[in-house]
UniProtKB/Swiss-Prot annotation:
Active site positions: 13, 139
Catalysed reactions, semicolon-separated: 4-CDP-2-C-methyl-D-erythritol + ATP = 4-CDP-2-C-methyl-D-erythritol 2-phosphate + ADP + H(+)
Gene giving rise to this polypeptide: ispE
The enzyme's E.C. designation: 2.7.1.148
Family: Belongs to the GHMP kinase family. IspE subfamily.
Annotated pathway: Isoprenoid biosynthesis; isopentenyl diphosphate biosynthesis via DXP pathway; isopentenyl diphosphate from 1-deoxy-D-xylulose 5-phosphate: step 3/6
Nucleotide-binding recorded as keyword: yes
Keywords associated with the record: ATP-binding, Isoprene biosynthesis, Kinase, Nucleotide-binding, Transferase
Record-given protein name: 4-diphosphocytidyl-2-C-methyl-D-erythritol kinase
Organism from which the protein derives: Bacillus thuringiensis (strain Al Hakam)
GO MF: 4-(cytidine 5'-diphospho)-2-C-methyl-D-erythritol kinase activity; ATP binding
Length: 292
């Protein structure tokens, strides 16, 4: 029997600006941030199973194969909401580092929602998929859409803006994991530097690359740097090597640099390879997903 298969890409995201406005009554934090997709992606193969079960496969030992996996949760949500009696095997080929502040797990969940919508002929719109994504995790709605957007609420309210000018994004991740809950737990909003998110929207919409580089900011940086000084050292090293702008993504520990010129990108990339285990040079993507 030929089983239906589908391949789906799950691109990573970076935060060009991330601010936390306060704690909500539901326990989440109110955020205002700008996210954009980059050309670093996991690849998922979705294969229909005759048996009514969800199977997660991956060669990466850090990828859970049970309900802790957000792709599993996405498949389970669709099965329960729409009474799907088929099963699915989800093979995740990881390229995005795990627990890195790049929304790898959220993007896998979003890719699963988009892919199963097609595989199971559910006929949902991308807005409906994004709404379902919000039930799984705060970044999943954005990852369903991709592109470049302002995210508010707990991160699930999405407003699209223009794509920033094309450039290189150099990523460096130290060999540590950072607990997002711990970072938010240690955040003191009156003791941190708040970025100007509105100004970032203006310079992105104006296509002002220098303005973007001058305006990047992440309110969580100081907290993560205090907990993990090696993250601050990577940022300092990337600045020293000459990146146009350097920032930690999400709650860390990945640090990214924006670089316009190819020759400088190669120099920074090679310099960081001797300093940090996981280094990537990719393009800023910023393209929105479509449902084929």
């Amino acid at each position: 029997m030929n089983r239906l298969k589908l391949l789906v890409k799950a691109p990573a995201k970076i935060n060009l600006s991330l601010d936390v406005l306060g704690k909500r009554q539901d326990g989440y934090h109110e955020v205002k941030m700008i996210m954009t997709t980059i050309d670093l992606a996991d690849r998922l193969e979705l294969m229909e199973l005759a048996e009514d079960r969800i199977e997660i496969l991956s060669h990466n030992r850090y990828v859970p194969d049970d309900q802790r996996n957000l792709a599993y949760q996405a498949a389970k949500l669709l099965k329960e909401k729409f009474n799907v009696k088929k099963g699915v095997s989800i093979t995740i080929e990881k390229t995005i580092p795990v627990a890195a502040g790049l929304a790898g797990g959220s993007s896998d969940a979003a890719a699963t929602l988009r892919g199963l919508n097609k595989l199971w002929n559910l006929g949902l719109t991308i807005d409906q998929l994004a709404e379902l994504g919000a039930e799984i995790g705060s970044d999943v709605s954005f990852c369903v859409y991709g592109g470049t957007a302002i995210a508010t609420g707990r991160g699930e309210q999405i407003e699209h803006i223009k794509t920033p000018p094309s450039c290189w994004v150099i990523l460096a991740k130290p060999h540590i994991g950072v607990s997002t809950a711990d970072v938010y737990g240690n955040l003191k909003l009156n003791r941190v530097t708040h970025p100007n998110v509105d100004k970032m929207v203006d310079v992105i919409n104006a296509g002002d690359y220098k303005g973007i580089c001058d305006t990047v900011g992440n309110v969580l940086e100081d907290v993560t740097f205090a907990m993990h000084p090696e993250v601050a050292r990577i940022k300092a090293q990337m600045k020293r090597f000459g990146a146009d702008a350097v920032l930690m993504s999400g709650s860390g520990p990945t640090v990214f640099g924006l670089v316009h010129h190819d020759s400088r990108m190669h120099r920074i990339y090679n310099g960081l390879k001797g300093f940090c285990e996981q280094v990537y040079a990719v393009r800023l993507l910023g393209e929105r997903e479509t449902l084929e």
